[in-house]
Each structure stands twice: as structure tokens, then as C-alpha cells.
């Protein structure tokens, strides 16, 4: 049943072409916009407070990525969340580097507190730090395993009423109903900058058409990452093939290759 829901979500994104508002970091804007276009969604990188109320009145979801955070961006992010709340839209939070500095940790928690409808997507160390536990990280890179973050994820689900996506060698999608384990992806994927940020952006696209868990996006990126890696000679060509496979992916391939387990 879950696999059928995931494949139907892929078709729905392509049919509905949802608009996804992104407040994201300078490093990955091009990557994430291209990924959203390739899957069939419509991205807009809107950072201005002056237009945010209007944008959120017709957008499908809001993605907030704190990767290049500063004092100018923080109030814009909070205001954007308020506008998403006013319009009943879901917020997808990527707490990049949470735990690496107090600014990142406090900002991530403030956004999580503000959002009425929330998906949190992070690596294990970010999820652990966001929950207030001691994490092992090196800047924005995780040193903790995905399994180690499961307890923290369950805490965040209860604390913020959120769904939590832990990405890593194994992906976990944790909701109040269940925990789903995904074992797709490829070991080359962490060598392309912004791969997690790409997942966060895709999560926004699928949230806009009704998947408020983050499962469909994680399933899709894991499968296309595997297929792309089979053709790639290294990280550079992996990035190119990843976009191609996001564009080419069909329901049958997704269902056949998906490695999913409900825990």
C-alpha cells in the first residue's frame, strides 16, 4: 500500500506541477531548482519579505533551508512561516548544521516552534542536535548514524507535531503513526554538495500535493540516486545523471527498485 501511495504521488506532482517557495542557501539554489523542475514541480527562490504574503497565498509549500544563515535572513524566515500558517501551507525545514553553532540551533528551533504544519529533513547529527541531545558533527556533515537519531526523531514528532526525515546511508521517515526505513541511494551521493538540500526541496514538492510525511520524496531520490550512480564515473557526472533520472523516472521503475520496510 505504501509503495502504491509513493508511485501515485510521483504522478500527482507531474500532473499538478505545484509551486514550491524556497528560502534556501546560496550554495544549492541552482541544484535544488533544477531538481524541482526535473521532477515536474515549479520552484521559486523568494527571499523578500515584501512579497511573501502574496507568494504563500498561491504556493503549495514553503521550504526553509538555513545553510547560509545570517541576521538578515532570520526574520524573513520567521515571517514566511507565519504566512504559510495563515494560508494553511506546510513548512519543510532543513536545519543545516544544527548543533554546529548556537545561531543555527536556536534558529532551527524557533522555526520549528512557529510552524503549524511541519516536516523536518536533516542528517542524523542535525536531528539529534535539534532535539537537544549531544551530536557528533563536522560543520554541516553528520558523524552520527541514522539509527542513532531515531530517538531524537520521535521526540521531535511529539514536541513539534512534525514528521521527521533522517537521511543517510539508511533513510528513516518518522511520524506519529509509524517509522519507515528506506535502503536505497548510493555511497557516491554524499560527494555531491547539496544532496540533502535537494531532498528537502523535493519534499516540499510532494508535500504540496498531499504527502505530509516526506516519504515519497525520500523514496524517489534514493531510487534515482542508485540509477544515476550506475551510469556515473564520479560526482560530477552523478549530478548530471541525477537530474536526467528525476525527469525519466516512471511508476514501474520506482516500485520495482524501492527497498522499503515498516519498522
UniProtKB/Swiss-Prot annotation:
ATP binds at residues 121, 167. GO terms for biological process: thiamine biosynthetic process; thiamine diphosphate biosynthetic process. It is an enzyme of class 2 (transferase). CDD domains: THZ_kinase. Pathway: Cofactor biosynthesis; thiamine diphosphate biosynthesis; 4-methyl-5-(2-phosphoethyl)-thiazole from 5-(2-hydroxyethyl)-4-methylthiazole: step 1/1. Substrate binds at residues 45, 194. HAMAP family: Thz_kinase. NCBIfam families: PRK09355.1 (NF006830), thiM (TIGR00694). Belongs to the Thz kinase family. This is Hydroxyethylthiazole kinase. It comes from Vibrio parahaemolyticus serotype O3:K6 (strain RIMD 2210633).
